[in-house]
Swiss-Prot record:
Its main location: nucleus. Residues 180-218, 359-390 are annotated as: Disordered. It comes from the Eukaryota. One of its GO terms (cellular component) is spindle. The lineage of its organism: Eukaryota, Viridiplantae, Streptophyta, Embryophyta, Tracheophyta. Residues 180-199, 375-387 have a biased composition (Polar residues). This is Cell division cycle protein 27 homolog B. The APC/C is composed of at least 10 subunits. Can homodimerize. Interacts with APC2, APC10, FZR2 and FZR3. Interacts with PANS1. Interacts with SAMBA. It comes from Arabidopsis thaliana (Mouse-ear cress). PROSITE patterns: TPR, TPR_REGION. One of its GO terms (biological process) is regulation of mitotic cell cycle.
Length: 744
């Protein structure tokens, strides 16, 4: 009965019927109370977004898997201290972190959100050491600015580590099959009730999977030894389905409960037969469905944090290893070379209906076919034992793969991750042009995906190339219309381009897609902000913060709106909240610097602009305002150096050139200032402030005709009301010397 209930719960979790899983698991715990069964119930609660239920259920438990699930529920409830205590018990200072790479990853997140960046980086690195394919850990290192080069992380050491794990599984499977073959050859009786003992079963399991306490439902029940042997003994059929599965690498950060439990599920009485004649291998799901499910789970590129951390453990179906085609030199495979051409629209549109499952089947690892019509297990193991090491196979994601195929697959996966990882690292270091060049090295089928195109859009956004950023994000929407990754930045791009209609349409689409995602409300807030309805915009940004308090950009957008409304106190609080979430969020440092600059607290302003500059040393906007602060502090020579750097960083940005001219005017270097302004007129021909400053220079040089001409040109360009008043005042006092004009 117990094994049947466990099987029912696992099936419900696999098919996302969480209500049934919870109900049946409650029956399981009532009939067979044990901590292992509580873990399965807690997993069901977590899948159903009931972290509070899992929290109360597991509080006080001691098994490693229970501690991990309890820490996960605490993390989702923002009880970070309790989560840390569960993973690192105070009374057991040398205790191993449960669940290997996933446990270290969770602990790293806890350290990150409690402002212990060095400890967080150590945990993320440790998780990558255990599982080099845990991409989420490497991305967190990039966010922290502590990532090593991708070639080092996803290099030969990582390849050897992964191959070693798979080879261990291969040798274990061969040993288990040989053992079963020997038993079958020496048996002369019906041995269906004489399966090997639970002690032997435990020994075999410990070689087949890493020892994670609490993952196996092998506890005793008052029901007779012979009956329990059916539940605890992994038959050869079950061994092929799950006992030889890859080690629990936790690539999707899933609680490792459901998959190990399949040891019981697969070895239930339904699959237990006379050991001298094994039935053909049965599958819970046919091969095509397995591929579709694994493909869908793997391609989900933008889950929210809560759903990522509580990813469905019941659907722990290992994805098939996909090969990555080599780089093609034809530049047309990308979206228009270094720029995004109009051809990309057709390219992505054609791929829009392309099935990920078909892509994996057509272009994935072509190992031995997964043939359900194989002979019985005993004969299969006999033939395997007679083959060379190269012909020895194991089942990965429902596909039989040889050791040679595994080696090739690992190499191809790591080659792909090296390119993606290096692009990600460069992006978070704000070396955006280098990041774009790196992403261009990807095969076209990976470049034309939502995640990569969003990263490309972010890179163009940081380069203040809003037109190219808009193209990239638009193509990302076409490739993955369901993905919200980067859509908050996309809405800001449309805000800067003043694309009112596009922004409104995007906001409505995002709200209809997921109204519980912070990106949706950020887009809505930007839409209202563009319409100058700052109070409504602020309400939308606050809603985004409410949905995800760890979304730093939402806090920053709140700060921008508070600053626009001249509520500097709340603006500073919002920026500080953003920095608590992400200390490298340079936008928040920049926002604080702007507030202090407007309050004429120049030392504070210079400090915050410098902090932003240290994080993003390639931003011409940050350099411009840093130079402005230095000039206000009478450090004009330093300010000029910074302005020169800003001009070199972005020739299209008129702000540093204008500020440089202002500084030169203050230093009485009028001829140099005029040269800068004449050059600036070519980049910003309709900027009224440029002509107004030229008018002031000509007035100082007593060239009144030219001064009047430039003041008039400035007025013709319809400047803001405050500038109009200043220009008219300068025109009225045209013949008054500056010394008299500036006297009190």
């Amino acid at each position: 009965m117990e094994a049947m209930l466990v099987d029912c719960v696992n099936n419900s979790l696999r098919h996302f019927v969480y209500k049934n899983a919870i109900f049946m698991c409650e029956r399981l715990c009532a009939e067979f109370p044990s901590e292992v069964n509580l873990q399965l119930l807690a997993t069901s609660y977590l899948q159903n977004n009931q972290a509070y239920s899992a929290y109360h259920l597991l509080k006080g438990t001691q098994m490693a898997q229970s501690r991990y699930l309890f820490a996960l529920s605490c993390f989702q409830m923002d009880l970070l201290n309790e989560a840390e205590s569960a993973l690192c018990p105070v009374n057991e200072p040398g205790a191993e972190i449960p669940n290997g790479a996933a446990g270290h990853y969770l602990l790293g997140l806890i350290y990150k959100y409690t402002d212990r960046r060095k400890n967080a980086a150590q945990q993320f690195k440790q998780s990558l050491t255990i599982d080099p394919l845990l991409w989420a850990a490497y991305e967190e290192l990039c966010i922290l600015g502590a990532a090593e080069e991708a070639t080092a992380v996803f290099g030969e050491t990582a390849a050897l580590s992964i191959q070693k794990q798979y080879m261990q599984q291969l040798s274990t499977s061969l040993g288990l099959n040989t053992y079963n073959e020997e038993r079958n050859s020496t048996s002369t009786k019906n041995t269906s009730s004489e399966d090997y003992s639970p002690r032997q079963s435990k020994h075999t399991q410990s070689h087949g999977l890493k020892d994670i306490s609490g993952n196996f439902h092998s506890h005793g029940v008052n029901g007779g030894v012979s009956n329990m042997s059916f539940y605890n003994t992994p038959s050869p059929v079950a061994a092929q389905l799950s006992g030889i599965a890859p080690p629990p690498l936790f690539r999707n950060f899933q609680p490792a409960v459901a998959n190990p439990n399949s040891l019981i599920t697969d070895s239930s009485p339904k699959s237990t037969v006379n050991s001298t004649l094994q039935a053909p291998r049965r599958k819970f799901v046919d091969e095509g469905k397995l591929r579709k499910i694994s493909g869908r789970l793997f391609s989900d590129s933008g889950p929210r944090r809560s759903s990522r951390l509580s990813a469905d453990s019941g659907a722990n179906i290992n994805s098939s290893v996909a090969t990555v085609s080599g780089n093609v030199n034809n530049a047309s495979k990308y979206l228009g070379g270094s720029k995004l051409s109009s051809l990309a629209l057709r390219s992505v549109t054609l791929r829009k209906g392309h099935s990920w499952a078909n892509e994996n089947m057509d272009e994935g690892v072509r190992g031995e076919p997964f043939d359900d019509s194989r002979p019985n297990t005993a004969s299969t193991t006999g033939s395997m034992a007679s083959n060379d090491q190269e012909d020895e196979t194991m089942s990965i994601g429902g596909i039989a793969m040889s050791s040679q195929t595994i080696t090739i697959g690992v190499s191809e996966i790591l080659n792909l991750l090296r390119t993606l990882g290096e692009g990600c690292r460069l992006s978070y270091m704000y070396r955006c042009q280098e990041a774009l060049d790196t992403y261009m090295k990807l095969p076209h089928k990976h470049y034309n995906t939502g995640w990569v195109l969003s990263q490309v859009g972010k890179a163009y956004f940081e380069l203040i190339d809003y037109l190219e950023a808009e193209k990239a994000f638009r193509l990302a929407r076409l490739a993955s219309p369901y993905c919200l990754e980067g859509m908050d930045i996309y809405s800001t791009v449309l805000y800067h381009l003043k694309e009112d209609m596009k922004l409104s349409y995007l906001a409505q689409e995002l709200i209809s897609t997921d109204r519980l995602a912070p990106q949706s409300w950020c887009a809505m807030g930007n839409c209202y902000s563009l319409q100058k309805d700052h109070e409504t915009a602020l309400k939308n940004f606050l809603r985004a913060v409410q949905l995800n308090p760890r979304f730093a950009y939402a806090h920053t957008l709140c700060g921008h709106e508070y600053t626009t409304l001249e509520d500097f106190e709340n603006g500073m609080k919002s920026y500080q909240n953003a920095l608590r979430v992400d200390t490298r969020h340079y936008n928040a440092w920049y926002g604080l610097g702007m507030i202090y600059l407007r309050q004429e607290k120049l030392e504070f302003s210079e400090h915050h602009f410098r902090m932003a500059f240290l994080i993003n040393p390639s931003s011409s906007v940050i350099m411009s305002y840093l130079g402005t602060s230095l000039h206000a502090l009478k450090r004009s020579e330093e300010a000029l150096e910074i302005m020169e750097q800003a001009i070199v960083a972005d020739r299209k940005n008129p702000l540093p050139m204008y500020q440089k001219a202002n500084i030169l005017v203050c230093l009485e270097r009028l001829d140099e200032a005029l040269e800068v302004l004449e050059e600036l007129k070519e980049y910003a021909p309709s900027e009224s402030s440029v002509y107004a400053l030229m008018g002031r220079i000509y007035k100082r040089r007593n060239m009144h005709d030219k001064a009047m001409l430039h003041f008039g040109l400035a007025l013709d360009m319809k400047p803001p009301a405050t500038d109009v008043a200043a220009i008219k005042a300068a025109m009225e006092k045209l013949h008054v010397p500056d010394e008299i004009d500036e006297s009190p």
